[in-house]
Design a protein with these regions (language model features):
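Short, conserved charged micro-motifs
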Residues: 76-81, 124
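Short, charged beta-turn/beta-strand-edge "cap" motif at the junction between a beta-strand
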Residues: 48-52
């Protein structure tokens, strides 16, 4: 089927990769009926045992499922958002907002959470430092 790839929670991996080749695509004539995440946005699982732990940056535009949330910044700060959403500070705030039987955070509650945004040059410095440290750890 030609169309836009559909990403579900199972397609966002714990290693931060996203499986686009899952065999599910939304035909072009139906894409408008789905939630769409643009390329370079961040998808995060917000429900169940993987909530707040499965997260990745998209390489392409996708349709996505109910248990995922899309963070689509207006400027090129996706990597900063990606790293912030994995920080102990955010995870603590996220975890304290979980509720329900399966443990999740609603999109409405996420919209109320504060994401600190320093000046762009500081954002770039933070991202570059995290990348350098990660690279030296991976070795």
């Amino acid at each position: 089927v030609q169309g836009t790839e559909y990403i579900a929670t199972k397609d966002v991996k714990f290693d931060n990769s996203i499986d686009y080749q899952n065999g599910v695509a939304i035909p072009n004539q139906y894409v408008a009926n789905f939630r769409i995440a643009p390329a370079k946005s961040v998808l995060m699982c917000i429900e169940g045992g993987s909530a707040g732990r499965k997260i990745g940056i998209l390489d392409q535009e996708v349709c996505f499922g109910n248990k995922l949330c899309c963070f689509a910044p207006y400027t090129d700060i996706s990597e900063y958002i990606f790293y912030y959403l994995q920080s102990p500070l955010f995870f603590e705030i996220f975890s304290s907002n979980k509720n329900g039987i399966i443990g999740g955070v609603s999109v409405n509650n996420l919209k109320q959470l504060f994401i600190p945004l320093p000046p762009l040059n500081e954002i770039n410095r933070i991202v570059n430092k995290i990348k350098a440290i990660s690279k030296s750890i991976e070795g």
